Amino acid sequence: MKVDLRKVPAVYMNLKQHTEKNEQMQSLLKQCGFETIIRVEGPYRPENPPAGCAGAHYVGVCEIDPPFVLFEDDCQLHNFKPVIEVPDNADAVYLGTSQWARYWQFSGPFVHYEKYNDEIVRVYNMLGGHSILYLTQDYVRMCQRICHHHSEIIGYNQDPGFAEVQKYFNIYSMNDPFFKQSGYNEAVTTCKVTDVGIHISDAQRFFDSVKYDLARLQGVPDLNRAPSTYHPLRIV
């Protein structure tokens, strides 16, 4: 399935006080050639920014029916291509990627992938959410539920919830990301998934190597030398 991203609505999340980021996103999206640009504003929660982030994603995924691309306002250009060929069964495609993933209640550089072609991989547990192409209503509805639960019930970012359900959907990612995050996360959002991830052919071996020694999942460094961490989230 060929997708001209310029003809897909671009929705970006931005708080009204972040005027500089608003200007940067308008400039970036116009530079990419997006024909429809929509700004949405999530809840301002200075006492709990992760919950605010999840709330913003909730507003974003409820704004319009798919297809649409949802952006966080710290996005920057990396290797953007306006026209892509994606699998016909895709529920979503991550245009911005991350080395980080969820694995057995740990967050760290454990992203599992399967190569579709040189440009696209299927992902099973990837964290991050700075640029995602949403394609099917079924998946959007799931993400709406996750965002609401994370924002209103447990008060945390939505991307662990996204990562934990990816294996139930057909979620793909650009191997070489189109967009990156600025600042500290730049290194882990500009790498190729195939350079840093765990291919599914190696998933069983990796699982067997840690299942009776979960301490091996603690302190694994990413490209920034930031360590993986045990980070369980409460249910309610």
Regions found by a protein language model. Give the residues of each.
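An acidic/histidine-cluster motif and surrounding catalytic segment
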Residues: 1-71, 75-236
